[in-house]
């Protein structure tokens, strides 16, 4: 069947449905009522009558509602689904009034109906409602995709997510699990004594990460503003305030950068700060959180992702970045003393590095190129270069490294954490240096956040900070190959493109 034929058939079906809608308006009146009272969801009905034996009819009258997914024998048998599950509807001249049966020819797959009737279980063991009353609640003007095949076009699944979920039980389950995971993160953090706050999504100065922001303009304030790339600086100001010693936020960040199977310009992060803790405390927190989430979704800490079996049972492997690079490439960065020596060693090993790269930039680049892909089971990579970590405390005895770790699994970065820098003079020095580097890269709009520095001058307690990429974590826990599979309505090109 070609596209032209398919579009013609779809148009014909739509016209037939429109004619039925016209007749229904004339015969019934309002076929899109504002309210309908059901006594049970389909799942509640199934649970209540779980022990009902086959070929038994009760005297119980119930009212249910849902979308029609299948119709057999001219509507004698229909399956209707609500969000909780399905129930079979039976309409017959011996049990169903003529007024209710008269509606059957007007009902199409995809319509939403309400049904009142007697509960029974068929000889084949199917829980069924013998319809006594049927009401049209929503007339669907478009045909549903074929239930058993769903939407085969992946892009169409993202563009028309409502149809994807309507016809794909895996997609429906995945988004139910997403809700459970996000709620689980929030519950875990609150039970651990963290207070949830909300910080600005619109910011006049963007910071807390190195990324390209989305820019907008506030007409009343006559002020250019940015969608936040991270909540870090505001959360630290909250810590300074003394409102709480343990603060967190679950919300979206926005970065005007590439789209891939692991990147979406709008994504969900959980970021938290814990006064009087350090990065090792944050490692423990990550392990406890991940284990809790795995148990809530799978009932065990071990689960499959693609052809791999992953384990969220702590403790996770911990390895300093210089050690990890040495193990994989043989390059001993701790024995290298200067930036020039680092570039020379990297080039000798076959890596293309920029002529102005520092020791730390060379180390981080080689780690990303050669080591990340080896980190399949959950691992904390610690001791990052200070060059690329302006907000972390130095490792005692090794001023080129900082108390920072990233958590990896399936070769993906899932989390990033520091022993947070709270020395106001060192913080200013590093932020000024970072600003100069940004301006050198052509990021002329980048500004120094003096309000944040003023708060740090006031005094921030020692603290551990952590950010977790919620979408990637959900990908792992739900066996989703693309980030767009776990974002309800992901970024996509316009249809015309």
UniProtKB/Swiss-Prot annotation:
CDD domains in the record: LysRS_core, LysRS_N
Residues the record lists as binding Mg(2+) 2: 413
InterPro entries in UniProt: Aa-tRNA-synt_II (IPR004364), aa-tRNA-synth_II (IPR006195), aa-tRNA-synth_II/BPL/LPL (IPR045864), Lys-tRNA-ligase_II (IPR002313), Lys-tRNA-ligase_II_N (IPR044136), Lys-tRNA-synth_II_C (IPR018149), NA-bd_OB-fold (IPR012340), NA-bd_OB_tRNA (IPR004365)
Gene giving rise to this polypeptide: lysS
Assembly mode: Homodimer.
Name listed for the protein in its UniProt record: Lysine--tRNA ligase
Binding locations of Mg(2+) 1: 406, 413
Protein localization: Cytoplasm
Subcellular location, principal: cytoplasm
Record carries keyword Ligase: yes
Family matches, as HAMAP family: Lys_tRNA_synth_class2
Entry similarity comment: Belongs to the class-II aminoacyl-tRNA synthetase family.
